[in-house]
Amino acid sequence: MDHYDSQQTNDYMQPEEDWDRDLLLDPAWEKQQRKTFTAWCNSHLRKAGTQIENIEEDFRDGLKLMLLLEVISGERLAKPERGKMRVHKISNVNKALDFIASKGVKLVSIGAEEIVDGNVKMTLGMIWTIILRFAIQDISVEETSAKEGLLLWCQRKTAPYKNVNIQNFHISWKDGLGFCALIHRHRPELIDYGKLRKDDPLTNLNTAFDVAEKYLDIPKMLDAEDIVGTARPDEKAIMTYVSSFYHAFSGAQKAETAANRICKVLAVNQENEQLMEDYEKLASDLLEWIRRTIPWLENRVPENTMHAMQQKLEDFRDYRRLHKPPKVQEKCQLEINFNTLQTKLRLSNRPAFMPSEGRMVSDINNAWGCLEQVEKGYEEWLLNEIRRLERLDHLAEKFRQKASIHEAWTDGKEAMLRQKDYETATLSEIKALLKKHEAFESDLAAHQDRVEQIAAIAQELNELDYYDSPSVNARCQKICDQWDNLGALTQKRREALERTEKLLETIDQLYLEYAKRAAPFNNWMEGAMEDLQDTFIVHTIEEIQGLTTAHEQFKATLPDADKERLAILGIHNEVSKIVQTYHVNMAGTNPYTTITPQEINGKWDHVRQLVPRRDQALTEEHARQQHNERLRKQFGAQANVIGPWIQTKMEEIGRISIEMHGTLEDQLSHLRQYEKSIVNYKPKIDQLEGDHQLIQEALIFDNKHTNYTMEHIRVGWEQLLTTIARTINEVENQILTRDAKGISQEQMNEFRASFNHFDRDHSGTLGPEEFKACLISLGYDIGNDPQGEAEFARIMSIVDPNRLGVVTFQAFIDFMSRETADTDTADQVMASFKILAGDKNYITVDELRRELPPDQAEYCIARMAPYTGPDSVPGALDYMSFSTALYGESDL
């Protein structure tokens, strides 16, 4: 027998005597069951277009009973008998009972004859059996089913509601709030639950029954007055009515789930269709953009001007910078959308997406490849055209510049070559004209290259198809014709000048000699003036001595320079003598130089004035450098004494801290006297600071007389003061440790001797191995076995808690003092608390306040945990855990 059968047999399919007793004991239950079961049957029979009025009469022929079973089971029963005789009715009822039995239901004491005879008790029992099998048995909530499942379902659904506590199917429903809570949980818009009152059960019940009938299609199976007027409502009636709620709401839940599933499928489908549409549109737009862009990139019509080509290049850059990047993003997004769409279709068991013809990703990639190929060709064409136009513009500008320079140079040259100025010129003028003409011929020859370059540029412009070639050719031809004419005129003038050259050669030679000697001498004077007026910046006596030596050497050259000046002036005087002798027209000036005798004399006088000024400046600077050198020596002498003194004191302090003798008080007194002697040295430091200030004011940046800088001295002095203070502090701490721990002076000396013995590098600290050897020498049994290593690790954790890898003397003293002195421990404190507590394992607040000072008592009360031992009393405190926490063996 399955779970339903056993449950049904044990709980509801009671023997006939029990049914009689139930009916006799409480007729109200029979009334409730009649109404409830009738309404339940009609809720199903109406689907077949019929109903019952009297439950014990309308099922007597078995026809409506068979119809009811067909409706609620969804199965066809055996064909009923249509006769009116008793045997036909019994046959139909038996068919119905057989069908019920075929569903695994045991029918106890229910026979067809009783049903046909209209036995109310048997008829109600049979209907209840049908309700159990077809309305309640299939209810399953978590691990429970049937009645327990229905009860659990009710409890879960009504759990959030106040004043509702469903524990059974009788009195838990009397106030009507349970029915209202079930409706509100699933259809909150149907009932205003907040307005219901527990003390108004009739209103609550009628509200629930009316709403269920009107909106949930659940007929009224119960009377509110019967439920309220009955001490214990009929359980079967309540279960039947509640099961209708379960099936109504479970059906709605299934419909909602089905609708959600359909919506989800449709949403996926709609999303996929939208992605397909987006892909098609994006692909179409991208291909259209490529189709429009390629002809623009294939347009290779060259421009005549650089401005026009640069505009094309700027348009192309705008295309690359502004127009193409969004399309690149669109192409990337298109591929992403395509892959995403295919993945979604595959995951949702949909066929793969096939884009329209010509819009495949491969088609877009091919079109994009064509675009980039054309784009690359267009860019190369643009750059080549720009380079060509740049070359043309450069050549055209070069042609214009060279032509303009040449034309400016030739301007007036023909008129100059045609003039007859040499006919009335003096000897010097003829010589000058001849030299000038020679210079012109040289200049003319030099310009030959420019003319050839102009012609070559014009030829290249023609070959490169320059748009303004006609004007270039016309200008070039004009320049060439003019050049030929200049050559002919130049030759004619040379011949005329050479005829008169010898007449004025002597004067010309003198002028030339004057120019050759005047120019170097003039340059020498200008250089001398620059040197004499040049400012100097020196930092040493050697540098100023070098400048003084150079100046003396310069003054030694002045007599020879004066002789050269007189010789140059003599040449000028000789020319004047010749002019006066031969009455030569000397209206012109020396053609070889612009330097006049007056200029030479003026510069010579200026040089003579600058020499004594330079002497004075060098003398003053020499005195300043001597003063600076004295400052250097003065600072160096003091620094060379103070620096080693500081170093010596540092070494002595280090030695004193290691090799201390006598009592700690003697050592402290000695160190303080030593500190006083160091402090008394401060005036010498201050004096050195004053000398350093003078050096800085004199802008002296180096000092060869010492390797010590003021910064070195300051740092050393501060380190010295810090070291002596730290050493004094260490001795003071040792005194505190000795006094606190009761260590004798002999023990302290022994500890110091052992520490210094193993501090072989005199660093003031011991490494792990040195410390271990020191402990062994003091009698500690620390072997190399695991136990010894563990003990040494424990000791190291005490003396080196920060894991620095070294042990200071103070840490060594602290450890040795703990090992040798009689110190208080957690056990001693616990023993003291036990005395105060009267030998109990706990202590009370009153005992603490009675035995300890108020502040210390409150301190203990605030931090002691409650005592939880078997002998605990109210207010007992745990002094043991408190004692261990004081020594870090547990947490406070």
Curated annotation (Swiss-Prot):
List of residues that carry Phosphoserine: 6, 471, 677, 890
Keywords on record: Acetylation, Actin-binding, Calcium, Cell junction, Cell membrane, Cell projection, Cytoplasm, Cytoskeleton, Membrane, Metal-binding, Phosphoprotein, Repeat
UniProt modified residues of type N6-acetyllysine: 95, 195, 676
Protein origin, superkingdom: Eukaryota
N-acetylmethionine sites (modified residues): 1
Domain EF-hand per the UniProt entry, residue ranges: 746-781, 787-822
An example Gene Ontology CC term for this record: lateral plasma membrane
Region (Interaction with DDN) residue spans: 274-733
Residue intervals of the Calponin-homology (CH) domain: 31-135, 144-250
Chain positions covered by the region annotation Actin-binding: 1-247
GO biological process: sarcomere organization; skeletal muscle fiber development
Ranges: Spectrin repeats: 274-384, 394-499, 509-620, 630-733
GO molecular function: actin binding; alpha-actinin binding; calcium ion binding; protein homodimerization activity; vinculin binding
Described function: F-actin cross-linking protein which is thought to anchor actin to a variety of intracellular structures. Association with IGSF8 regulates the immune synapse formation and is required for efficient T-cell activation.
Protein family per UniProt: Belongs to the alpha-actinin family.
Protein name listed in UniProt: Alpha-actinin-1
Lineage: Eukaryota, Metazoa, Chordata, Craniata, Vertebrata
